[in-house]
Amino acid sequence: MDGSRRVRATSVLPRYGPPCLFKGHLSTKSNAFCTDSSSLRLSTLQLVKNHMAVHYNKILSAKAAVDCSVPVSVSTSIKYADQQRREKLKKELAQCEKEFKLTKTAMRANYKNNSKSLFNTLQKPSGEPQIEDDMLKEEMNGFSSFARSLVPSSERLHLSLHKSSKVITNGPEKNSSSSPSSVDYAASGPRKLSSGALYGRRPRSTFPNSHRFQLVISKAPSGDLLDKHSELFSNKQLPFTPRTLKTEAKSFLSQYRYYTPAKRKKDFTDQRIEAETQTELSFKSELGTAETKNMTDSEMNIKQASNCVTYDAKEKIAPLPLEGHDSTWDEIKDDALQHSSPRAMCQYSLKPPSTRKIYSDEEELLYLSFIEDVTDEILKLGLFSNRFLERLFERHIKQNKHLEEEKMRHLLHVLKVDLGCTSEENSVKQNDVDMLNVFDFEKAGNSEPNELKNESEVTIQQERQQYQKALDMLLSAPKDENEIFPSPTEFFMPIYKSKHSEGVIIQQVNDETNLETSTLDENHPSISDSLTDRETSVNVIEGDSDPEKVEISNGLCGLNTSPSQSVQFSSVKGDNNHDMELSTLKIMEMSIEDCPLDV
């Protein structure tokens, strides 16, 4: 029993002290266990010792209810590892700085001793060779320069890491010696054994851990990419701007409501792919404008020429033959004039293709709102006249100066035709003029290199246009057998009068003179007056019918009057069933456009 207990007691030894010391609380002589003489036995002492050892071992191995150990995330964190590495590097640099201080003090002491020995060697007789003295001087100069480079400041150490590493690594290669003295005092010239032995007396402990210090210098000072690869980053102060890869993948963030994608330069080929991830409202309009801008001028001309068609009241739609490139301009224009009818429509604007603007959806909405405001105001007032409409249109045009005046006037003209304030013949004639002007603009756009050659053609086209316009006006008026047809340079503008009218009063209004009236009767066949002002208004007032006003202005009709020009009025009387008076205005060498009649 005692043997087994003794073996067990020796196997379980206390961790807090040596096994054979029974002093203090381990002794049973001075505590409550010492009751009788049996407690003085060795077995009893060992038993108490074992119980106490187990008790204290349990206390020492007890764990806290709260886990205070280092979390796993800290050990796996890259940031924490970088911080620990930086702290370790700082400690190593501080230790290296202390070592440099020690080496500096040791080198100063050696420098004093070496300077004394050098002074003694320089006092030798002149018969000895001077090569050894020169070598000693060179070695001393190298030693002093190396001592100056060893500055204990951390900044100087941090900046000169690469240079010192070069010195340390290149030293053993040149001298093929493992001693630190040969590394420190590497000279350019040949070395003698005496000088090597002189400087090699320094103990090895003055420059410890040279290999470890070399590895520390070769490491980066921090784990930051901006510090490791600073040459790849031009300006670190600029803010970070994210970039998107040019891929067809759809971003998951585009499904969110308040997500705005990164902007980048859009190519025409990539715009259709980016349409799924694009959230801007103006994407469709930008795509449409980009497509139209890429089209060439020839494609635009062919596409727009195919849209220009002529409509007849009893004939079907016939497109203009502008698709062939071999046909000349005169043939196209003559053919267009032959096919033109009173209801000819043209879907062009009056601008050439090079300067014609492409309106986006937003601009079209602005023009639609402009027309909507005008129509709403007309409907609110109810009653209106031509003068009132003109004032209303001018006021709205002045209020919308950010829009183009030509397009607004075109829309107002269409609205006026729809309201019935302008006859359809005038609108059709205006469209004919628009079609001819478009042809002229297209010709001007295609004939820019041949400007000198086309000057004569422009005058011929103007004369041809005047002649065709005069023919259209004569065909629209009633004819008589005694009517004289005009020449290509002069034509007559007829004014129709009913048979029930008794007389016509013609008033000539000038800006500087008073009003002059003259009465035309059947007994007076013609009256000639000279025009002294540029703007002339002729008021034709019939006796029985409503008043009609014909205004011929310089801005609308293109009249450039002079004192030499004359106006002739003539009256023609026919049979009893066709009694009429025909007043013709003879205009010499002037371009005429359509003049609207206000009913």
UniProtKB/Swiss-Prot annotation:
One cellular component (GO) term of this entry: photoreceptor connecting cilium
One GO process term, biological-process aspect: protein localization to photoreceptor connecting cilium
Signal peptide interval: none
InterPro entries: SPATA7
Keywords: Cell projection, Cytoplasm, Cytoskeleton, Leber congenital amaurosis, Retinitis pigmentosa, Sensory transduction, Vision
Feature: compositional bias, Polar residues: 166-175
Subcellular location: Cytoplasm, Cytoskeleton, Cilium axoneme; Cytoplasm, Cytoskeleton, Cilium basal body; Cytoplasm, Cytoskeleton; Cell projection, Cilium, Photoreceptor outer segment
Renumbered residue ranges of the record's region Disordered: 163-205
Chief location of this protein within or outside the cell: cytoplasm
Disease: Leber congenital amaurosis 3: A severe dystrophy of the retina, typically becoming evident in the first years of life. Visual function is usually poor and often accompanied by nystagmus, sluggish or near-absent pupillary responses, photophobia, high hyperopia and keratoconus.
Assembly and interaction partners: Found in a complex with CFAP410, NEK1 and SPATA7. Interacts with NEK1. Interacts with RPGRIP1. Interacts with RPGR. Interacts with NPHP4. Interacts with NPHP1. Interacts with AHI1.
Function text: Involved in the maintenance of both rod and cone photoreceptor cells. It is required for recruitment and proper localization of RPGRIP1 to the photoreceptor connecting cilium (CC), as well as photoreceptor-specific localization of proximal CC proteins at the distal CC. Maintenance of protein localization at the photoreceptor-specific distal CC is essential for normal microtubule stability and to prevent photoreceptor degeneration.
Protein name per UniProt: Spermatogenesis-associated protein 7
Organism: Homo sapiens (Human)
